[in-house]
Amino acid sequence: MRCVKALQLTLAVIKPDAMAHPLILEALHQKILENFIIIRKKDLIWRKADSEMFYAEHSGRFFFQRLVEFMSSGPMRAYILAREDAITHWRTMMGPTKVFRARFSSPETLRGKYGLTDTRNTTHGSDSIESAKREISFFFPEFSAEEWMMREEPHFRLGHTEYNEESQIHTVKHT
């Protein structure tokens, strides 16, 4: 993937409902692979406290407790993805948050195809540059977006990458 503009990073999360189904998980990974450069990937299980911290901005909302319980109910997968306009592209691929709406207005989206309910809607994605920075730091505290942009982004933008099947991420191709 060769790009003219600087690459943008975003966070993508595959939620526990999709992780529970290997065929759905594989389909989601393939869609991501077809559309993005995968910078980092991590499988994890949250404690309830992790979920409460991540979704703190929704504390007090009617869905907060249900969301917290669900996100700590099983494994999930987090990705750092890169491409031009990565945030917008991932959000478009996900489709509307409300699964009922996604099924009728955007059936080709990930939530339209695989979502079950508004909480069990298969995916999460950052909605702005600021939230992407914050969310990437939450899931990948060891990752420095600034350092990556300075040292690695030019190589990725120019297409000097290779996909590692074992780790399921892209790396800089050393020639």
Swiss-Prot record:
UniProt cofactor(s): Mg(2+)
EC number(s) recorded for this UniProt protein: 2.7.4.6
UniProt keyword Nucleotide-binding, yes or no: yes
Keywords, ordered alphabetically: ATP-binding, Kinase, Magnesium, Metal-binding, Nucleotide metabolism, Nucleotide-binding, Transferase
Function of the protein: Major role in the synthesis of nucleoside triphosphates other than ATP. The ATP gamma phosphate is transferred to the NDP beta phosphate via a ping-pong mechanism, using a phosphorylated active-site intermediate.
Family matches, as SMART domains: NDK
InterPro entries xref list: NDK-like_dom, NDK-like_dom_sf, NDPk6, Nucleoside_diP_kinase, Nucleoside_diP_kinase_AS
Name of a matching Pfam family: NDK
UniProt entry tagged with the keyword Cytoplasm: no
Annotated binding of ATP, by residue: K15, F63, R91, T97, R111, N121
GO biological process assignments: CTP biosynthetic process; GTP biosynthetic process; negative regulation of cell growth; negative regulation of mitotic nuclear division; UTP biosynthetic process
Protein name: Nucleoside diphosphate kinase 6
Catalyzed reactions per annotation: a 2'-deoxyribonucleoside 5'-diphosphate + ATP = a 2'-deoxyribonucleoside 5'-triphosphate + ADP; a ribonucleoside 5'-diphosphate + ATP = a ribonucleoside 5'-triphosphate + ADP
Active-site residues, as the UniProt record annotates them: H124 (pros-phosphohistidine intermediate)
GO cellular component: mitochondrion
GO MF entries: ATP binding; metal ion binding; nucleoside diphosphate kinase activity
Family: Belongs to the NDK family.
